[in-house]
Amino acid sequence: MEYGLDLEYSFNEFFKGFGLSSEIAHIIWLPIPMLLVLVAAVVGVLVTVWLERKISAAAQQRIGPEYAGALGVLQPIADGLKLLVKEDIIPAKADGILFTAGPILVLVPVILSWLIVPFGQNLLISNVGIGIFLWIALSSIQPIGLLMSGYASNNKYSLLGGLRAAAQSISYEIPLALSVLAIVLMTNSLSTIDIVNQQSGAGILSWNIWRQPVGFIVFWICALAECERLPFDLPEAEEELVAGYQTEYAGMKFALFYLGSYINLILSALLVSILYLGGWGFPIPVELIAKFLHLPINAPVIQVFTASIGIVMTVLKAYLLVFIAILLRWTTPRVRIDQLLDLGWKFLLPISLANLLITAGLKLAFPQFFGG
């Protein structure tokens, strides 16, 4: 779908109506996209935490949060405020600088990765040509922060958790990147906008999940491992490592780990939606909607409606995957560290490599179905 609302253009036009120049309007606009990302990420975390509490309660035949607002919807806010006012303790023998920098280095790359997530044709912060490659590069920074946090804590459980996190991330980063390369090969572009547009030809049948079922499965497994979700939560296994690299953290620093974990889960689900499930695309062509309403295709009403539907479709697809991830947490046992590494190196890596080679062959043989 090639139509949509351009927020920056609309914002500039709005301020031009007050007599401001386009340069001043652009300067005013600069911090707004990042604020929108932060608000969207925090709201997404609050919704996900509430969903996880309710789903886990249902899995264990409990009621779950009930008293903090209707159906307990304010419970995540109460949890956040509790962590915010807790004392920030740095262990006496810890490396204070690295101890403080670790959580920041974990959270910042995840936040920056949202820059390339599109919710519509023009609804993204930065349409860089190397969008998906930028995400892979940013995601490779996070293990450094985890290892740094484990090392700086001067605690054996923290160090072991940090080492596990680094080993796990390295093991699953490669098959994840190879599965993404298969999509890039079909699309001939690293732009997330181009990847979604390439899936808009024949509705749901154009989604990459039908042409890349193996890549979809590999990507989702690797994404869960990158997010350290059960059954891949070895770096913070409570029964073995207390809380892993988070053991010595409290207050706001611990909240940064907590926030980063859930933002990363939502980001991974959004990227699966974009890469494999058509992103913001929906079955009814925008031309038919405009014709039904007797409006031109570029009418403001059509643009706002298209943008709204695109956001809803992207978020719904992502939260379907978040729901699956939460269910997996309460229905699957934790694997051993050797099993986790074997799965990454001995199974997912060769499978993703074979999938990439097969995709290249199919593209040469059937360019009309696998990209021209």
UniProtKB/Swiss-Prot annotation:
One GO BP annotation of this record: photosynthesis, light reaction
Origin: domain of life: Bacteria
Coiled coil: none
UniProt topology in membrane: Multi-pass membrane protein
InterPro entries, alphabetized: NADH_UbQ_OxRdtase_su1/FPO, NADH_UbQ_OxRdtase_su1_CS
EC code(s) of this entry: 7.1.1.-
Name recorded for this polypeptide: NAD(P)H-quinone oxidoreductase subunit 1
Species, as recorded: Prochlorococcus marinus (strain MIT 9312)
Source lineage: Bacteria, Bacillati, Cyanobacteriota, Cyanophyceae, Synechococcales
